Amino acid sequence: MSPSSVKRVWMYWTKTKMLLSIKKFGRKNKILDEESVELILEVNKEQNLGARRLEKIIEFQHGKHIPHNAIHKVLLHHGLANVNRNKSKRRKPWVRYERKHSLSLVHLDWHDGKFNGKKVCAVLDDSSRCILAGGEFDAETTENSISLIQEALDNFGWLTSISQAMTDHGTQFYANKRDKNGDADSRFENFLEKNKIKHIKARVKHPQSNGKFEKWNDTYEKNRYRFDNFDNFVNWYNTIRFHESLDTKWYLQTPDIAFWARLPEGCKLKMFLDRMETELNVGDRI
């Protein structure tokens, strides 16, 4: 305590014979109006994310700034968040790597789903984090893996072919028994080669190589129960949920928006010409 504070307390005591009350430091707690509380609950129901993330989304979508601490209190009050006393206040520096263009690299992986006991696999675009194809299966098989790549090609191959596919060394993707030349008869690898897709194998015992897919698995486990089927979940993930890894300084993005925005320029030109041709054909028929 500074000498001036001691003097002030002493002078107050000599005049009033009472202790000087100490005011609370910091800002007063902000009391949110009912409209703000309803907005927080509405956006949380749609996005199912934490307070720090909801703060950015609410400001981006609705132009209204609500501090994340106030949002967290609302979530706690409604049983939508937990108190985490061990959470670090300082976030670690975050470095990410991603491809510049959509369809230049996709990730595949199998996951044991806890929601319904199914085996889950998807084709995830590296640049946009968009799910290009996926499903819940009874077994992890090479046939199912191939069918998902084929589905992605059927849906988006008219734009441009997938350049590369990254997987782990699972038997669904890779034949571990090889001859002296390093060759093996793997149906999945043969399928990729036939479609001119380069197969990239993630480093063994190095989960960071497929970290984007691990993040998607986590999102699946936290949100799958909210949807009647897998397709509805993927539609929410692709088109409604703002993905933090896609944030820019000026705007937020869903994987679907990022996918179309990050296509190579040649693909965008092709889309424009195809649309012009369609409109001209419609005009000729009229």
List where the protein language model places each region.
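Mobile-element integrase/transposase regions
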Residues: 64, 69, 76-124, 128-130, ...
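RNase H-like two-metal-ion nuclease catalytic core shared by retroviral integrases
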Residues: 167-169, 178-222, 253-254
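Key DNA-contact positions within bacterial/archaeal DNA-binding proteins
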Residues: 4-8, 69
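Alpha-helical scaffold elements within enzyme catalytic domains, especially in hydrolases
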Residues: 12, 42, 191-194, 236
